[in-house]
Amino acid sequence: MVCTEFIETQRLYDQMHRVQRIRKLQQDIAIIENVLYNPSGMKWSDMPRSQNPNDDKKTKLMDDKAYKEKKLDIEKKMEQAEKHILEKIIEDISLLPENPKGPMNLVLQDVLRYRYLNGYEWEEIMKLMFPDNDAFIDMAESNLRKLHIWNGKALMKFIKCQQK
């Protein structure tokens, strides 16, 4: 891949990783809330009446939760702004000339949206795009190869649209 092509597709990869970071932060916050608000019998501090409130485990958890929520808000704002720009570029793929064998631009747009804007793993995309072929392992491998080929074609079309 040429350096300029790498730079042009890097926005997609950055967006995918941003979506994954958002999911991880949401999971972390849910775990902290579960520990904080469920009576699990957890010992909150080492001493019965701690003189130093900074040693209090509950305070540390609440601070950690506040930090992660702030970080989550920042990531979500960045994700929404970038998603809007990338969605416009992906929409432009439908304006490119179609392959005479069949309309593929919509499929390629779906692959880009699922993988990079929504941050889905390849197996999740395969289940969405090929829902009937779950039972056969050979079909799953074949469909996964198709997805990778479509991803390559979609990235090339994304580059063409971005250069306009």
Give the role of each language-model region.
Residues 130-153:
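Short, basic interhelical loop/turn and adjoining N-cap
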